[in-house]
A protein has these predicted regions:
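Short beta-strand->loop
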Residues: 113-119
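Short C-terminal tail/terminal secondary-structure segment
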Residues: 111, 147-151
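Crotonase-fold acyl-CoA enzyme core
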Residues: 1-98, 132, 136-137, 146
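Amphipathic alpha-helical segments that line or abut small-molecule/effector binding pockets
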Residues: 52-53, 120, 124
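Short, charged, surface-exposed hinge/linker loops at domain edges
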Residues: 104-113
């Protein structure tokens, strides 16, 4: 709740417990408003109308409710949540760093750009990554029918 949601709102992946999670920005119950970008990031994650509903009514959502409106990206049973969070971190760590960083730059700014600008950014990303050692490893792994091991 509150600051405990504002930090995850700045993250690309947000996991929640299936049971017992309490997710929301209840600051209006305290006579104040969300800080640290909570309202702006919430509106970008779930849309303006959902953000207005959640903030002005100081609603608290469960994990599954938050998943239903796109506030979290995954929901897991409490006993499995940490395992899946670690699994996600390991999965991302195994990805090609340059390609991940380049694609994030494209995606994070895409809402602020025209389609033509986003397509240009994607084309530039292809050119920036295609000759990388990771791209060579990915292609070799594909041809050899094995899992790639990126540097």
């Amino acid at each position: 709740l509150g600051g405990g949601l504002e930090l995850p709102l700045a993250c690309h992946f947000r996991l929640a417990a299936q049971d017992g999670a309490r997710i929301g920005l209840p600051e209006l119950h305290l006579g104040t408003v969300p800080a640290w970008g909570g309202s702006a990031r919430l509106a970008r994650r779930v849309g303006r109308d959902q953000a207005i509903d959640l903030i002005l009514r100081a609603k608290t959502l469960s994990g599954p409710e938050a998943l239903g409106i796109g506030l979290v990206t995954e929901v897991w049973p409490n006993a499995e949540l940490k395992h899946h969070a670690v699994e996600l971190a390991e999965e991302l760590a195994a990805m090609p760093r340059l390609a991940v960083a380049t694609m994030l730059r494209c995606l994070v700014t895409s809402d602020e750009k025209t389609l033509a600008e986003s397509l240009r950014d994607e084309r530039d990303a292809v050119h920036a990554t295609l000759s990388s050692p990771d791209a060579a490893e990915g292609l070799s792994a594909f041809v050899e029918k094995r899992r790639p091991v990126f540097g």
